[in-house]
């Protein structure tokens, strides 16, 4: 990141214009030759992957892959406005979707999650009341809001990720997701779906 700009703000500034123009997680999928040169971690992953015997390489932010994967759970696909979460080992991402449209998301450090704060975050997220700088000040990774769905319109809240049991005491009716029948495949499913959309392959049944 340039001097005076935090790494998290710099990453946020990469994501926002892309999502403003194409509000779907798969918009943040990069073919090997498309990875921005200033995204050091993605470039390092790309360079490692290029050593494998493959005709093409795709790279995607793991949080974006996970929330896309969570939306492919059959129960989410059968509903209207939804909140999906991926509670991973290091980071937790919560996102609001209407169909394939990513309306908002927030990213937090999993170790800092407290049930009461996560409950309020989910409502604030859907109501469009979360600000990026506010989340950074709390020690989180940031937030993005394109439009507010309204918490009262949410039809399902679904969680994936290896540490989702941390949300067991939530006051919200959080369902446990398993795209492709396996909670631990969430990110893989999201990456596969992003590549499928890019390549124009036939739809894949993930339930």
Predicted regions and their residues:
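A broad structural signal for short, well-ordered beta-strand segments within beta-sheet-rich domains
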Residues: 54, 91, 101-103, 154
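Gly/Thr-rich phosphate-binding beta-strand-loop-beta motif of the actin/hexokinase/Hsp70
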Residues: 80-99
């Amino acid at each position: 990141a340039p001097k005076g700009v935090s790494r998290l703000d710099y990453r946020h500034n990469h994501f926002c214009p892309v999502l403003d123009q194409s509000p779907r997680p798969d918009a943040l999928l990069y073919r090997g030759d498309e990875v921005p040169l200033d995204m050091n971690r993605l470039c390092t992953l790309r360079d490692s992957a290029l050593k494998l015997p493959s005709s093409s390489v795709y790279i995607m932010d793991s949080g974006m892959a996970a929330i896309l994967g969570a939306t492919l759970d059959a129960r989410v696909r059968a509903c209207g406005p939804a909140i999906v979460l991926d509670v991973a080992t290091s980071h937790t991402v919560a996102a609001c979707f209407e169909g394939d449209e990513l309306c908002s998301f927030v990213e937090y450090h999993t170790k800092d999650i407290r049930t009461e704060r996560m409950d309020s975050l989910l409502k604030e997220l859907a109501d469009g009341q979360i600000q990026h700088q506010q989340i950074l000040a709390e020690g989180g990774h940031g937030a993005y809001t394109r439009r507010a769905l309204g918490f009262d319109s949410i039809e399902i809240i679904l969680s994936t990720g290896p540490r989702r049991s941390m949300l067991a005491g939530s006051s919200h009716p959080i369902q446990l997701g398993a795209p492709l029948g396996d909670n631990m495949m969430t990110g893989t499913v999201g990456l596969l779906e992003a590549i499928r959309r890019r390549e124009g392959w036939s739809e894949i049944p993930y339930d």
